[in-house]
């Protein structure tokens, strides 16, 4: 029996030793695998920008749906939903037919300038290109490639542009010409929030024509009055094609603001991000020429810009706006925040991050006001619901499905402004969203009437009227007699013409199309376009 016991003990010891050996071998293999994984991860993530998505395998089908991203906690993978491919350049899922870069694994790698080196590479006032060539500092990030390798235009965000605007300096930035604050939430004039009139700006984008004129008449019917007794007002960002300029003329006569939204409304969003100063001038200053001529607007009141698709054009857009004497932009979106942001001038650095996918925000100092678009909170139950990304345009808040939901949405977002710093509340629309959803329109009109009846400190005003208040802050009591808010208070009389000229026109710039232009003025020779905004044929 003793012999069997010794054999059993020996067998147990051998098994234990084998188990130890297997354990050590498994740990060594695991360690080696971990090292290989870490090495592979380092290789994959080398030279990748923060937050950049890329493919492991290029090609059509599922390969074009799958991308990965390097994060602090390791590799993260996603797959686009069925029917969508991942657009490497746009860094987002898009419809299959719209994605043309399935064969690309990574975004195009751009050569970066040598801005940060242990020893200076250039003399004072000069900076180094990616190939170590020195050029003047002011040539960096000016919209033109001055380095042989183009690197002077490849590192131009707010953190890297060597000519970026300085942080807000309230001792230098003084009303009425300049307004800034460190976080963008300071009330102009340091008024207590309870003394600030709550401004609401309603805006509509795109053409004004027979598809939406009756909708606008229903909303702005002359019966809805601000506390000062004047009609409520809106701002229209007008694009050219299919616009009825006699209707624009009448809208302006009624005291609403007309602003520009481009001539072509170019469908390629990347165009607006990368357009030159000259491109922006033709689109926006040209659109102003068209509006002023064919709507007979002669009071220099067309001073606002909003880019199509809310694609910010960086320094080029704002340089054009300075050169063409535009007063304000309303394209830049601020992420959902509490409290909300007030309008600011672009002399100093933006008080919030550049928000949105692949946006190109301005980095330099510009003599332009920004009517920043505060994102709206689309949660149905803000006290319980999980965080949801905000939305800038009301019609992009995709979870609004019923009139009751829209009514609650309006009340919640109004309260977020009214009960905090009373930053202007922007409600930005495309007319079709209200026209095609009568339940939404009914809820909207009910809400406007309710707000006007229950508050004596809420004003529906234009974008320019907001800036006029920021430049010269007035309390709720003083607002009733604030002269800029009483212009065209309640307009009576007849339109400039009852039956406009219907001009069937063509243009070399729009080949193969005959387009109808309606105006109270005489018909031009050609359909107005980028190189011929007057339509007189002078290219």
Curated annotation (Swiss-Prot):
Binding to the accessory protein CPAP3-A1 is essential for chitinase activity. SMART domains: ChtBD2, LDLa. Keywords: Carbohydrate metabolism, Chitin degradation, Disulfide bond, Glycoprotein, Hydrolase, Metal-binding, Polysaccharide degradation, Secreted, Signal, Zinc. Highly expressed in epidermis and head. Moderate expression levels in fat body, Malpighian tubule, testis and midgut. Low expression in silk gland and ovary. Its EC number is 3.5.1.41. Pfam families: CBM_14, Ldl_recept_a, Polysacc_deac_1. Residues 1-23 form the signal peptide. Residues 121-157 form the LDL-receptor class A domain. Zn(2+) binds at residues 206, 261, 265. Hydrolyzes the N-acetamido groups of N-acetyl-D-glucosamine residues in chitin. The gene is CDA1. Induction: Up-regulated in response to 20-hydroxyecdysone (20E) and juvenile hormone analog. Also up-regulated in response to the transcription factors BRC-Z2 and POUM2. GO terms for molecular function: chitin binding; chitin deacetylase activity; zinc ion binding. Disruption phenotype: RNAi-mediated knockdown results in delayed pupation. It comes from Bombyx mori. InterPro entries: CE4, Chitin-bd_dom, Chitin-bd_dom_sf, Glyco_hydro/deAcase_b/a-brl, LDL_receptor-like_sf, LDLR_class-A_CS, LDrepeatLR_classA_rpt, NODB_dom. It is found in: Secreted. This is Chitin deacetylase 1. Belongs to the carbohydrate esterase 4 (CE4) family. Glycans are attached at residues 244, 296.
């Amino acid at each position: 029996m003793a012999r069997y016991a010794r054999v059993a003990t020996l067998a147990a010891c051998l098994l234990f030793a084998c188990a130890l050996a297997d354990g050590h071998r498994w740990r060594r293999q695991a360690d080696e695998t971990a090292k290989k994984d870490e090495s592979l991860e380092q290789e994959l993530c080398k030279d990748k920008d923060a937050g950049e998505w890329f493919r492991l395998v290029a090609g059509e089908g599922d390969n074009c749906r799958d991308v990965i991203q390097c994060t602090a906690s390791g590799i993260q993978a996603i797959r686009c939903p069925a029917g969508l491919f991942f657009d490497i350049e746009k860094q987002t899922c898009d419809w299959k037919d719209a994605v043309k870069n399935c064969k690309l694994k990574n975004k195009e790698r751009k050569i970066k300038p040598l801005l940060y080196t242990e020893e200076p590479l250039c003399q004072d006032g000069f900076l180094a290109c990616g190939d170590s060539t020195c050029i003047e500092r002011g040539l960096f990030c000016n919209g033109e490639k001055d380095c042989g390798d183009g690197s002077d235009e490849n590192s131009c965000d707010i953190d890297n542009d060597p000519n970026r605007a300085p942080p807000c300096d309230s001792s230098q930035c003084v009303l009425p010409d300049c307004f800034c604050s460190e976080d963008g939430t300071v009330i102009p004039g340091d008024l207590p929030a309870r003394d600030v009139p709550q401004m609401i700006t309603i805006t509509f984008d795109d053409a004004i024509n027979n598809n939406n004129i009756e909708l606008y008449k229903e909303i702005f019917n002359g019966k809805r009055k601000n506390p000062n007794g004047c009609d409520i007002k809106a701002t229209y960002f007008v694009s050219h094609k299919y616009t009825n300029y006699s209707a624009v003329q009448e809208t302006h006569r009624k005291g609403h603001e007309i602003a520009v939204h481009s001539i072509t409304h170019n469908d390629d969003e990347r165009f607006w991000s990368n357009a030159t100063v000259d491109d922006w001038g033709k689109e926006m200053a040209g659109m102003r020429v068209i509006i002023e001529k064919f709507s007979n607007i002669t009071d220099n009141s067309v001073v606002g810009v909003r880019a199509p698709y809310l694609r910010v054009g960086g320094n080029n857009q704002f340089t054009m706006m300075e050169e063409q004497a535009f007063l304000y932009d309303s394209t830049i979106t601020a992420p959902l925040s509490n409290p909300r942001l007030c309008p600011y001038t672009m002399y100093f650095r933006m008080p919030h991050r550049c928000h949105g996918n692949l946006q190109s925000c301005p980095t330099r100092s510009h003599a332009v006001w920004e009517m920043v678009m505060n994102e709206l909170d689309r949660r149905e139950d803000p006290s319980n619901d999980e965080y949801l990304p905000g939305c800038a345009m009301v019609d992009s808040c995709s979870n609004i499905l019923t009139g009751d939901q829209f009514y609650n949405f309006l009340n919640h977002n109004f309260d977020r402004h009214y009960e905090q710093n009373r930053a202007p509340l922007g409600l930005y629309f495309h007319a079709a969203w209200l026209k095609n959803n009568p339940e939404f329109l009914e809820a909207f009109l009910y809400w406007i009437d309710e707000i006007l009846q229950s508050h004596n400190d809420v004003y529906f005003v234009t974008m320019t009227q907001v800036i006029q208040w920021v430049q010269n802050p007035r309390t709720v009591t003083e607002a009733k007699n604030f002269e800029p808010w009483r212009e065209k208070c309640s307009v009576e009389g007849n339109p400039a013409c009852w039956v406009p000229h219907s001009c069937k026109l063509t243009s070399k710039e729009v080949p193969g199309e005959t387009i109808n232009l309606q105006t109270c003025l005489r018909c031009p020779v050609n359909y107005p376009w980028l190189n011929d905004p007057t339509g007189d044929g002078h290219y």
